[in-house]
Amino acid sequence: MNKSTLLIADIGGTKSDLALFNAGDIRTPQVQRRFINAQYSGVEEILVQFMATVGDVPTVACFAIAGIVSKHQGRMTNLPWEFNCAHLKGRFGFTKVILINDLTAVASCLKHLNPTNPSDIHTILKGRPDGGAVTGVVAPGTGLGEGFVVQCSRETFVTGTEGGHSDFAPVDAEQVALLLWMQKEHKTVSFESLIAGPGLARLYDFCKVYHTMGESTDVMKEMAGKVDRTPAIVAGAIASQPCPLCLKVIELFLRILGSEAGNLALKIYAKGGMYLGGGILPRLMGHVSFDGFVERFLNKGAMSPMLAEIPVTLILNKNAALIGAAGYLVEALSEDGGEE
């Protein structure tokens, strides 16, 4: 078994990315594989298949999961998968296993991103950075991840949260109608239920009725028989001849996301900046205007001038969660601490 190699896993609601990193270079995975979760009964089945292909198995691992982590255990929010560090050690021979929330991993990657590399980040709102102690992260994907980083002297505290499950608050007539429409079938309406996972499909169905808009034949064909309609909606919005309905959906999605990103920035006083993660937003860049996002991010009454000073940055590095989890594990090993 190899002590200098790290096994890193980013376990999302839809897919899982597993990789091996050398402890001295956490920017570049030595081996990387992607697994579609629906094809597996749990993470152990994925691990068995992955390890069969890597040869020399590492002794240390970090699992970043889209779910709740408590001490040495965790469970996924959108999958019936559970994690137990002691069990994983016994089953696979690890000497150390760390379990963290996936947004803890994304937040941990921030210091490893290169601000001058256009493949790593893109500025949405320049702001006036002052090196504040707190930085926030919002990442729409299968779920709506939220997290933050606190820098205190030479110590750094990083954590993911379940803030995406907070109650959706409409800010205009369209969003009031959306809330009432959602409440017909849902007892609670969270931000996650609208701007993550099946949320875009819900926005699509709502906009079709609220704005009395017809559907694109091409988009309907792409959606036919698909459980997840989000890829078709995004593709329709960024096409060379965009689908008007899909574009309307994405514009509403960005406005709601902007509101919630502004909410988080206010709550944690994110003078260190706000970062946007997830797989949807990078696809939109260059095709769809983020003006609606910025407008709603700033629309906080007396606090708008303060928010205008906060830089907002889009994370483009596709391995952000893996890099962050690898960095988290390296630091835990150097301190001989962490969540085992």
Locations of regions flagged by a protein language model:
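Glycine-rich phosphate-binding loop of actin/hexokinase-like ATP-binding domains
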Residues: 117-124, 128-192, 285, 293-298, ...
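Conserved phosphate-binding catalytic cores of ATP/NTP-utilizing and phosphoryl-transfer enzymes
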Residues: 1-2, 48, 99-135
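ATP-binding/phosphotransfer module of carbohydrate and carboxylate kinases, centering on a glycine-rich
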Residues: 1-57, 177-340
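Short beta-strand segments
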Residues: 62-66, 100, 135-143, 147, ...
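Short coil/turn connectors at secondary-structure junctions
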Residues: 3-4, 93-95, 130-135, 144, ...
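Active-site nucleophile and cofactor-binding loops and adjacent substrate-binding regions
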Residues: 35-38, 76-80, 98-105, 125-128, ...
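A short secondary-structure junction signal
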Residues: 110, 147-151, 206
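Short beta-strand-loop/turn "lid" adjacent to the catalytic site in phosphate-handling enzymes
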Residues: 54-117, 282-286
